[in-house]
């Protein structure tokens, strides 16, 4: 309750206070570049910030997104920074996120909107709010962008959003979902903003706390981890017992509420292993089923390595 009251006091929020004109996308990689492109297509004045000069040059060359170094004139900050270690993409790291938060706190104008789209451990957004000294509207709107199906699972799809306080949440929903949608949200019907404000037109599902929004993303990927690990475990079971995994999977998947996945070369990528570790590290009570799933994936990787080695020996 203290943070809600303090935010309302320091931000000095009024319902019609912020105009969303000048948008800065921080991080122009696999996630940030499509976000910047989408925001620009919606008619906003979009700029980019990235430590990688090649990423900045690429954004300007492809979409005309200009780079900017000073944050003083920005209305909305959309943060799309990677939250994994450079030398180990399965390990979470938020040092870059904290550094950019300090830059916003130092240079930006009070009362602006800061939206974290990066996947973060539980409690991170509120830590950022503290670094920002309660002077900004801060929300977490985790991305659901999927590169292989961008047309279906791109920037504009149903998303979860949470704010560090009610006024932050209202402002975030107005930017993403639009005033008309905001008025339809439970407990947000009293909001009446200026309908001339543009929005991204992205449907948002609001939750009661920013921590719930943070958890929603990492739980999504932890659930995916479990599904893949089960497929890996079942594959090894079938091989050990002379059963066709494909035939069994196809038969089981005829049931309407079952969808066993196809195991491949282990659980990898930038998101699923890292986010599963975020979930495991989010509580002193560890998820036994996820820990077991990690062991299954390790066993499966070793199993695949042995299979490849055996095939190579036969071919030679």
Enumerate the language-model features and the residues they cover.
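Structural/interface elements that position substrates and couple domains in central-metabolism enzymes
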Residues: 1-316
């Amino acid at each position: 309750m203290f943070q809600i009251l303090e935010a309302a006091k320091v931000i000095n929020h009024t319902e019609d206070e912020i105009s969303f004109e000048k948008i800065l996308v921080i991080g122009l990689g696999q996630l940030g570049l499509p976000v910047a492109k989408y925001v620009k297509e919606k008619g906003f004045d979009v700029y980019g910030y990235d430590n990688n000069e090649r990423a900045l040059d690429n954004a300007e060359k492809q979409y005309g997104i200009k780079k900017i170094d000073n944050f003083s004139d920005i209305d909305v900050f959309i943060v799309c920074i990677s939250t994994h270690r450079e030398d180990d993409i399965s390990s979470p790291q938020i040092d870059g996120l904290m550094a950019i938060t300090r830059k916003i706190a130092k240079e930006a104008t009070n009362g602006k909107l800061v939206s974290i789209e990066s996947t973060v451990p539980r409690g991170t957004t509120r830590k950022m709010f503290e670094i920002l000294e309660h002077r900004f509207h801060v929300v977490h709107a985790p991305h659901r962008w999927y590169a292989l199906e961008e047309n279906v699972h791109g920037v504009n799809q149903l998303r979860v959003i949470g704010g560090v306080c009610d006024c932050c949440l209202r402002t975030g929903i107005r930017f993403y979902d639009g005033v008309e949608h905001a008025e339809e949200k439970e407990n947000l019907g009293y909001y009446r903003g200026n309908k001339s404000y543009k929005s991204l037109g992205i449907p948002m599902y609001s939750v009661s706390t920013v921590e719930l929004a943070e958890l929603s993303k990492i739980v999504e990927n932890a659930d995916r981890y479990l599904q893949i690990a089960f497929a890996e475990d079942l594959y090894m079971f079938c091989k050990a017992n002379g059963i066709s995994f494909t035939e069994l999977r196809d038969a089981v998947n005829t049931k309407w509420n079952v969808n066993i996945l196809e195991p491949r070369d282990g659980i990898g990528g930038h998101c699923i292993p890292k986010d599963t570790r975020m979930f495991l590290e989010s509580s002193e009570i560890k998820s036994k089923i996820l820990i077991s799933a990690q062991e299954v994936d390790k066993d499966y990787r070793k199993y695949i390595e042995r299979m490849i080695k055996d095939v190579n020996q036969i071919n030679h």
